[in-house]
């Protein structure tokens, strides 16, 4: 019985110890880094990507609105497709030129 009691005391002293070990220091650093990443960096990244997304979405939304009005007015699907095709070709050429620079 004595060894079990001593073992229980040893386990309790280890578990209830207030001294920092190397492992606990590393764990605290990892938790702090995780907290910083989720609370600061992730918010900045989302804000940056939201802005970029809105910037790229606005021209597409304008194209949609422009051609949606034309289709509703005319109902001519062929001319609508030709207009969209022309604008998409212009966008593709613009993207190619931007990539070269």
UniProtKB/Swiss-Prot annotation:
Record's subunit section: Component of the biogenesis of lysosome-related organelles complex-1 (BLOC-1).
The entry's localization annotation reads:
Endosome
What family is reported? Belongs to the BLOC1S1 family.
The protein's name in its UniProt record: Biogenesis of lysosome-related organelles complex 1 subunit BLS1
This chain's source organism reads Zygosaccharomyces rouxii (strain ATCC 2623 / CBS 732 / NBRC 1130 / NCYC 568 / NRRL Y-229)
Superkingdom per UniProt: Eukaryota
What's this chain's function? Component of the biogenesis of lysosome-related organelles complex-1 (BLOC-1), a complex involved in endosomal cargo sorting.
Instruction: Mark the transmembrane ranges.
Output: none
Q: Which UniProt keywords apply?
A: Endosome, Transport
**Where is this chain primarily localised?**
other
Single GO cellular component term: endosome
């Amino acid at each position: 019985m004595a060894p079990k009691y001593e073992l229980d005391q040893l386990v309790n002293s280890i578990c209830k110890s207030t001294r920092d070990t190397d492992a606990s220091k590393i764990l605290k650093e990892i938790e702090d880094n995780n907290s910083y990443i989720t609370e600061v960096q992730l918010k900045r990244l989302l804000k940056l990507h939201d802005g970029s997304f809105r910037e790229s979405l606005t021209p597409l939304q304008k194209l949609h609105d422009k051609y949606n009005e034309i289709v509703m007015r005319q109902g001519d699907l062929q001319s609508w497709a030709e207009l969209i095709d022309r604008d998409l070709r212009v966008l593709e050429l613009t993207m190619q030129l931007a990539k070269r620079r």
